Structure formats: structure tokens, C-alpha cells
Amino acid sequence: MNTKGKIAGIISNLVIVEVDGPVSQNEICYIKTSDVKLMAEVIRIGGKNAYIQVFESTRGLKTGVEVEFTGHMLEATLGPGILSKNFDGLQHDLDKMEGIFLKKGDYTPALEDDKIWVFKPLANPGDEVIAGSWLGEVKENWIPHKIMVPFNFKGI
């Protein structure tokens, strides 16, 4: 079960959250408002409080609002299709956004899940692989993207 918390204080885009369990430095969390989820990152921990930086406007937030921690750090998604995109610092696809400013709570996936890519295997059935081993490759235009065993891979 993920750690949860409630907003105890707000100073601009710094939000103080009283947490009910463990959180980590740089962990991602979401503030759940009535209509959107706002992404934030833990920048400091002190006692039962996590100090989080919200990546967009905190206007309208109130104390007592629920915050859910993901257990994950801020991560970049890598894979075929990424080189032809325009991203901001949180890997929002700016070409899919409408208008000059991002809508509050609006997020786009970094990669298109429904796009089909031709996979060329580099590993053979029965090969022993470890985290980081190349399994195959996928070409995006003329650039081959190596597909690797995930770094959190455990087991056979």
C-alpha cells in the first residue's frame, strides 16, 4: 500500500504534507483535488512532514486535501518514438497539448503505446540475461534502439 498524507500547509508551489508512512527524497506524489491530480516531488523530509514541490499552480489547494505517494522517483521514459517528440522537463508531449499553456493536471504519455514497431531479437531463447542485457532492437528511422532487460529485473 502506498503512503498517503494530507496537506498541512501551502507556500506558493511548496506544499507541506503530513504523511502516514515512509516517503523518500525525490519521490513523486499526486495531490488529489476534485477535478485533477497535480504531480509533485518530495524535496525535503522532516519528522512526519514531507515538503513537496508542485510542478504547476497550487491556486485553489486547501489544507486537508489528500496526497498519494507513488513509491517511484521522477523517471524518464525511453524507447522508440522518443526522438521525434517535443517535450517539456516532465516529458509532456508539447505537440499534443492545446494552447500556449498546459492545462492544470493535464499529462500526456511520452510514448505511443498503440504504435507497432518491428522488433529484431538479439538474444536467443535459452540465453541467460541479467538487468541491462540487450534483448533486441527496434529501428526508429535510421537509429536502432536497444531493448534491454529492465534494471529492476529479478529472477529467471
Language model region names:
Residues 1-156:
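Peripheral, non-AAA+ core regions of ATP-driven protein-machinery
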